[in-house]
């Protein structure tokens, strides 16, 4: 297994798909990385040379991935909660943040129904 950005990349998958195992890299980003490195999308990870893997590592160093990205997201949500804006309050109450209605739906976020006690 090749190790890129602290993540073990599966050997038998195509490079384009294997790079998406890294948090913060989706299919479009992986395609940009491979285009910049000059590697074919259909190449398997096991067929990559050490030089190609190093090229990919160098390109990924410039992108915010894994721990840094998780930390940034966590801090931005915490900032919203600290300034007590609407989005921050919705995060704090575990409700939908992006304007979805929560009168009848939003069961996934709210959790299971609570029984009505008389």
Curated annotation (Swiss-Prot):
Record's keyword annotation contains Ribonucleoprotein: yes
GO molecular-function term, one example from the UniProt record: rRNA binding
Segments for region (Disordered): 94-118
InterPro entries linked: Rbsml_uS13_C, Ribosomal_uS13, Ribosomal_uS13-like_H2TH, Ribosomal_uS13_bac-type, Ribosomal_uS13_CS
Keyword Repeat among record annotations: no
GO annotations of cellular component type: cytosol; small ribosomal subunit
Keywords: Ribonucleoprotein, Ribosomal protein, RNA-binding, rRNA-binding, tRNA-binding
GO biological process, one term: translation
Domain of life per record: Bacteria
Coiled coil residues, start to end: none
Quaternary structure (record): Part of the 30S ribosomal subunit. Forms a loose heterodimer with protein S19. Forms two bridges to the 50S subunit in the 70S ribosome.
Similarity field: Belongs to the universal ribosomal protein uS13 family.
Task of the protein: Located at the top of the head of the 30S subunit, it contacts several helices of the 16S rRNA. In the 70S ribosome it contacts the 23S rRNA (bridge B1a) and protein L5 of the 50S subunit (bridge B1b), connecting the 2 subunits; these bridges are implicated in subunit movement. Contacts the tRNAs in the A and P-sites.
UniProt-recorded name of the protein: Small ribosomal subunit protein uS13
Organism per entry: Fusobacterium nucleatum subsp. nucleatum (strain ATCC 25586 / DSM 15643 / BCRC 10681 / CIP 101130 / JCM 8532 / KCTC 2640 / LMG 13131 / VPI 4355)
Taxonomy of the source species: Bacteria, Fusobacteriati, Fusobacteriota, Fusobacteriia, Fusobacteriales
């Amino acid at each position: 297994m090749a190790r890129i950005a602290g993540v073990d990349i599966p050997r038998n998958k195509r490079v384009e798909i294997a790079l998406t195992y890294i948090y913060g890299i989706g299919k479009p980003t992986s395609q940009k990385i491979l285009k910049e490195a000059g590697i074919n999308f259909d190449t398997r990870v096991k067929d990559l040379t050490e030089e190609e893997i190093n090229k990919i590592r160098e390109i990924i160093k410039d992108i915010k991935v894994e721990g840094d990205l998780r930390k940034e997201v966590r801090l931005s949500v915490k900032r919203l909660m600290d300034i007590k804006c609407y989005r921050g309050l919705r995060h704090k109450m575990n409700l939908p943040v992006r304007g979805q209605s929560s009168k009848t739906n939003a069961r996934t976020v709210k959790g299971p129904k609570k029984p009505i006690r008389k």
